[in-house]
Design a protein with these regions (language model features):
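Transmembrane alpha-helix/helix-exit interface in multi-pass inner-membrane proteins
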Residues: 1-20
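Juxtamembrane inter-helical linkers in multi-pass membrane proteins
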Residues: 20-27
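Membrane-embedded catalytic cores of phosphoryl/pyrophosphoryl-handling enzymes
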Residues: 27-136
C-alpha cells in the first residue's frame, strides 16, 4: 500500500524544498495533483513502513495471546518511529509522513484482519469439502 501511494505521490522530500537548499516549493501531501517542482515520491515514508508493517501481527495475536499482541504492537510502533525518525534526521521526511505511514499500516492490518474473520467460514468449508470426481 505504501509503495503504491509513494509511486503516485507528487510530494517532494524536505531536502528537495527551496527552504532547505533544494528547488521544490512546499505543497501539502494532500494537495493531489499539485507538482511542487521537485522529484516527488516522498510520501508516505518507506523506511517507517518497514517497522509499521509489523502491526498486522497484533491483529493476528490479539484474541488468543493479548499480552503478546500488545508487546508485538509496541515493538512494531517503536521500530516504525525509529526508522521514520532516522529519515527525519536525514531530511528525507517530515514527522507527518511517519505518522501517516503508521496509520496506513494500521488500517491495512485492520482491514486484512476483518477480511480474515469474514472469510474464515468459507475457507474452513473449502478445506473440508470433498473434491468432485473427475470424469475420464
Amino acid at each position: 500500500v505504501v509503495s503504491v501511494i509513494k509511486n503516485l505521490s507528487n510530494t517532494s522530500c524536505p531536502w528537495d524544498l527551496a527552504e532547505f537548499g533544494g528547488v521544490a516549493r512546499y505543497a501539502s501531501h494532500w494537495a493531489l495533483g499539485v507538482i511542487d517542482g521537485g522529484g516527488g515520491r516522498c510520501f508516505p515514508g518507506g523506511h517507517a513502513s518497514a517497522g509499521f508493517a509489523f502491526v498486522g501481527g497484533y491483529f493476528a495475536l490479539r484474541r488468543k495471546q493479548p499480552v503478546a499482541a500488545r508487546w508485538w504492537l509496541a515493538g512494531a510502533v517503536l521500530m516504525g518511529l525509529v526508522l521514520g525518525g532516522s529519515q527525519q534526521v536525514r531530511g528525507a521526511h517530515f514527522m507527518s509522513h511517519t505518522l501517516w505511514t503508521g496509520w496506513l499500516c494500521w488500517t491495512t492490518g485492520w482491514l486484512v484482519a476483518l477480511a480474515a474473520v469474514a472469510l474464515r467460514p468459507r475457507i474452513a468449508a473449502f478445506l473440508h469439502s470433498t473434491p468432485a470426481p473427475v470424469a475420464d
